[in-house]
Amino acid sequence: MIDVNNFEYMKIGLASPDKIRSWSYGEVKKPETINYRTLKPEKDGLFCERIFGPQKDWECHCGKYKRVRYKGVVCDRCGVEVTRAKVRRERMGHIELAAPVSHIWYFKGIPSRMGLVLDMSPRALEEVIYFASYVVTESGDTPLDKKQLLSEKEYRAYRDRYGSTFQAAMGAEAIKKLLQDIDLDKEVDFLKEELKTAQGQRRTRAIKRLEVLEAFRNSGNEPSWMILDVLPVIPPELRPMVQLDGGRFATSDLNDLYRRVINRNNRLKRLLDLGAPSIIVQNEKRMLQEAVDALIDNGRRGRPVTGPGNRPLKSLSHMLKGKQGRFRQNLLGKRVDYSGRSVIVVGPNLKMYQCGLPKEMALELFKPFVMKELVEKGLAHNIKSAKRKIERVQPEVWDVLESVIKEHPVLLNRAPTLHRLGIQAFEPTLVEGRAIRLHPLVCTAYNADFDGDQMAVHVPLSSEAQAEARLLMLAAQNILNPKDGKPVVTPSQDMVLGNYYLTLEREGAIGEGMVFKDANEALLAYQNGYVHLHTRVAVAASAVNNVTFTEEQKNMLLLTTVGKLIFNEILPESFPYINEPTNSNLEKETPAKYFVEKGANIKEIIASREEVAPFSKKILGNIIAEVFKRFKITETSRMLDRMKNLGFKYSTKAGITVGVSDILVLGEKDEILHEAQAKVDNVIKQFRRGLITEEERYDRVISIWSNAKDVIQGKLMKSLNKRNPIFMMSDSGARGNASNFTQLAGMRGLMANPSGRIIELPIKSSFREGLTVLEYFISTHGARKGLADTALKTADSGYLTRRLVDVAQDVIVREDDCGTDRGLLIGAIKEGNEVIESLYDRLVGRFARKTVKHPETGEVLVAENQLITEDIAHIVENSGVETVNIRSAFTCNTRHGVCKKCYGRNLATGTDVEVGEAVGIIAAQSIGEPGTQLTMRTFHTGGVAGDDITQGLPRIQEIFEARNPKGQAVISEIDGVIAAINDVKDRQEVVVQGEVEARTYAIPYGARLKVIPGQKISHGKELTEGSIDPKELLKVTDITAVQEYLLREVQKVYRMQGVEIGDKHVEVMVRQMLRKVRVSDAGETDVLPGTLLDIHQFTDANAKVLLQGKQPATARPVLLGITKASLETDSFLSAASFQETTRVLTDAAIKGKRDELLGLKENVIIGKLVPAGTGMNRYRKVDLVKTTQDDMNVENDEVYVEQ
C-alpha cells in the first residue's frame, strides 16, 4: 500500500488540459450556488453535490439513501455518491472554456515567460490577447512576417489584397497556435549559436530566452499549456459559503470570481451558437479572458474586480501570498490542541525544572490522561462517565490529576520567541488561582517580567516527545546561551542585591575580629546579635573543610565574613572557598593572604586591611560559568536554586530601598555649569565674528555640555557613600547605572530632537531639583523618540531574524568530518588599537586546522584537528602566537550543511556538536535575537559629509543584504605604493603605483583619506575612511577576503553595543551568502552561461565533462544578500513561503522543479518531521528489539539498535 505521508520529493509543473479533466469529477455548467428556499446546492452549480460529493455524511441529495450501509452507492435519482462529506474538500470540478484563455502568471510575470518563448514583447502580447491587434500566425507567400502585429485597418487591407493566403488571428487562440508551432530543439540550437557572437543587450535577452526554452525542453511541459482550454474549479469546502445569523450568507470571494467566469463563458457559448457578429464575440472573449485573469490573480492587470464597498476580491494568488496566505498562515503556522495560555506570576519557591500550572488549566490539558486513569483505577465505569466526572469536577479527580501530571513535562513559550530558549520544558506542579507560576531565573531567557506578560502552555503527547522535552528542553538543561556559550540563567535584580549585601564587608562592624571554631558557631553568634553579616571574623580553616586548602592552611585561621561563610555553603564541595571577586580565586584557590597563624592578633590584622569588594552580578555569572564547566548540569542547577534562595532571603533582610534623602545634589555643580556657560558664550562670540562656521559652533557647544555632564558624573560617583542604597543597586548590577544616578542628582544633560539631532540647550536641572517648564518640554522630545524607536526597532529586528532563518534553515550538521584541507587564518579583531574580539574568544571551542607551535620554544601547543579548550586557548594567547589556522564553516566541504569538525563546539551545551543539530537556525536566532538591543539611529558625527557611518541595526541589515554601504570607501584594486595624492579642482586623486601599472582613483568630495604618500597598500584595502562595498571587494580579491571582512564588520557592530556572539554563527550566515557562482563560460558542459548555480552543482557539472576530456565551464563567485539568497534556494517550497510567492511558483512550474525536501521548512509544509535533530533519517531508523533473557545483563526490556 502507498503511504501518503512518506514521499521522497515533491514536483511541480504545468497541467495539460487532459490532466485538468482527469482531476475533475464533473463540469460546472451553471453559476448558481445554493437554492434560496431549500438551502441545498443547485445541480451543475458551483456547489453541486453530484460533482463534489454529499453535504452530509452518507446521505444523497434527494434523501433516498441514508446511513453507512449504502457506502459507495450512486443514487439513481439524483446521481450523488453516498460517501463522507469531507470529500468536498478534495474533489475538483472543471469549466470547459468556449475560447482558449491565457494564464496571467505566464503572460504578465516579470520576465514574461510567454514573451520569452515567442520572442515577442509583453506589450505586443497584451495587444493580441486582449483583442486590440491581429497577429500573423501563417504568413503563406505574402511579404508579412510570422508574429507580425496588424491593426484592424491593416488586417482588412491585407485580407483584400491577399485573400486567404495568409492567416492572422487575435486573442489567446492566436498565441496558442504560435506556441504549438514552436520547435524547441531548433530554437535552442539557434540561440546557442547566437550566444557565441552576441554582446550586450542581445546577449542578455538570448540567455534569458535560452533559460526558459531549456526549462520547457527538459521538464516535459508543453509551451501551449500556458494557454488554458479547461479551467479547474477548486473543491467547495475550500471556498465555503456559510449562513450567518439573520439568514444572510457569507461567501468566499472565489465564488464571485468563478460565477463571473461561468456567466461570461455561457454567454460566449450562446453567441457562438447564434453565429453573432465577430465584434460582439471578440468583446465577449476579451471579457472572459479578464474574468479568468481576475480569478487567478486579481489586480495584476488593470483595475481589480471589486466586491461590495469597493473592496478588491481575493483571488487564488492572494490565497497563497503574504502573512495571511496559505503558506505562512496554515502550512508553517498551525494551531495546536492541548495548549492554553495565562498570565505569569513569579514562583520563588519552585525548583529550576518546575513551573506552577493552575489546577483548572491542568485538568483541561490533561483531560484524556485523567479519563484513562479514572477508568483504570475503577473510579469510573467507562470513558463517558469519566468525562462526566471531570466536567462536574468531582473531588476524586484531583488526586488522579496529581498522579498523571507527576512525570509529564509541559512546554512553556513566551511570544516573541526570538531564540530557542523562548520555549522550554518544565515539570508542572498544581497551584491554586488562575496564573502560571514561573521560576525567576528563567526570566532572562524568556525576556519575561511579571507586569502582565502571558505565556502559552503545550503538552507533549507521545512518549518520544516527552523524552525529548525532558532530555533536551528541560529548563535545567538550558543553562548556556547558544549565542555565546555564557550562562543565560544569571540571577537578576533582587537576587543580585541579596547576594551583594550578603558578601559586603564593613570596617568596625559589631564583633569584628572574633574567632569561631566553625561556620555553625559563627551563624549562632549572628543569630544572637553578637556579630553582623558584614563583620570580618576568623574561622578555623579545618572546619571549612575545603578541598583546595593545603595541609598547612588547614591548621590556620581563615579571615572572612559571616556573610561569605553563608554564601560559600551553596557552592559544590570541591570548589575553592570564594573570599574575593577575582578570577584566580574562582578558578584556582583562595589567596594565601586570607590565612593567618593561630594565636596571631586577629583584630590588628583585620584593621590593617582594606575592605574586600562584594560580589556583583558579573562575579555571580562567572561563578555559575565556572561551576558549569566543572560539574555540568545537575550540580549547576542545584547551586542556582540555592543562590536564588539566598538572594531573596537577604535582600528581604537587608531592607534596601530608595528614599528621596538618598539622592544628594552635588555642591560644586553650579560652578561647573557657570564655567561651561562661559565657554559656550565665548564660542558664540567667535561665531558672530565669523571665525568659525555654524557646524563648528554647534559641535563645540555640544562637546562643552557633554564634558560638563561627565565632570559632574565623575564627582558625583566619587562623593557617593558605598552604603548608599542607590549606589548599591547600581554597583551590584541589580538595576540602574551611573547615568541614571547623574540624572537624579547631577544634571539631565543634552537631549535629542525627533530627527535625532542633539538639541544644544542642555537640561541643567536634575530630577531631585525638579525641571523647569522648558526643560520638561525638551525632555519629552527625547522620551518620545525613544519609544518610537523601540517600536520600529522591534519590527525591523523581527524581520531581520525571519530573513536570516530563511536563508540558513537547511544548514544542519550532516557528518563527522568533511575532510577539507583548507582552514581559516584568524587573529584578534582590532579597530585601531582597540581589541574588539580577542584571539582567545575566537579560538575557544574550535578545531585547529594546522599544528600550532610556541613561537620561541617550538613546543606543540595544539595538534592538527585537536579541539581548542579554554585552557589551551589561554596558553596559545599568552605564548604570543598572533594567528592560528582553524577549521571553519567557511571552508567546510559538506553539502547542504556543515561537519562536526568545521563547526566545533556546540555553544549551548559546551560539548561537541551532534550530527543533526540545526546550526543554521541557531545561528540565525543568535544574530537576530540581540537585534532589538542594537541602536536604531544612524550616528551623525557632527554632521560632516562623508562621515555618516551607519551603525547598529541598519548596518547589520546593510551587511547581510550586501547593499552598497552609505559613505562607501574607495579601495585599491592592485598591490603597490601610494605614489602621489594630487588636488584636482576641488577633489583629490590618489595614484597607486603597482609593479606593472599605475591606477588613479578619484576621491569623492568630503571623504577623508586613510593613506599617505609612500605607504604600501595591498589590493582590497581602503584608501578612504568608510565601509567597503563587499561586492566590489569580491571583484578585486577572493572569497576568503570577503568572508573575513563581513565577519569582522558584523562582530564590530555587535561588540560595540556590548553584545557577544560566537564567530561560528556569523560564519554560517556568510557562507550561505557566498554559496552561488555565476557561469561566465559554459565550455562543453550543459550549464547555461549567465545562470546562478550552487558551487557543488557547478563542480559536479565540470567533473562530468573533465572525465570525458572535454572543456569545463568557468564561473565567478557571487555575493547575494540574504533575501536574494533565500529566493535562489533549490527548494521552491521554501522560497515560495518566504516572499514573492507567485514569481517563485511560476518559475518552478515552468522548470518542472523537484523539491528534494532537504530543509526544515519544506518538511514542516508537507507535514513531515523536520530532518534535523532526532528527526534525521539516521535516528529514525531505530527499532525496539526484544532480546532473550540470556543476553540480558541489563535490567531494561529493550535495547536500541540502529538498522
UniProtKB/Swiss-Prot annotation:
Zn(2+) 2 binds at residues 818, 892, 899, 902. One of its GO terms (cellular component) is DNA-directed RNA polymerase complex. It catalyses: RNA(n) + a ribonucleoside 5'-triphosphate = RNA(n+1) + diphosphate. Zn(2+) 1 binds at residues 60, 62, 75, 78. Its EC number is 2.7.7.6. Binds 1 Mg(2+) ion per subunit. It holds the Pfam family RNA_pol_Rpb1_3. SUPFAM superfamilies: beta and beta-prime subunits of DNA dependent RNA-polymerase. One of its GO terms (molecular function) is zinc ion binding. The keyword Ligase does not apply. Coiled coil: none annotated. GO terms for biological process: DNA-templated transcription. Belongs to the RNA polymerase beta' chain family. DNA-dependent RNA polymerase catalyzes the transcription of DNA into RNA using the four ribonucleoside triphosphates as substrates. This is DNA-directed RNA polymerase subunit beta'.
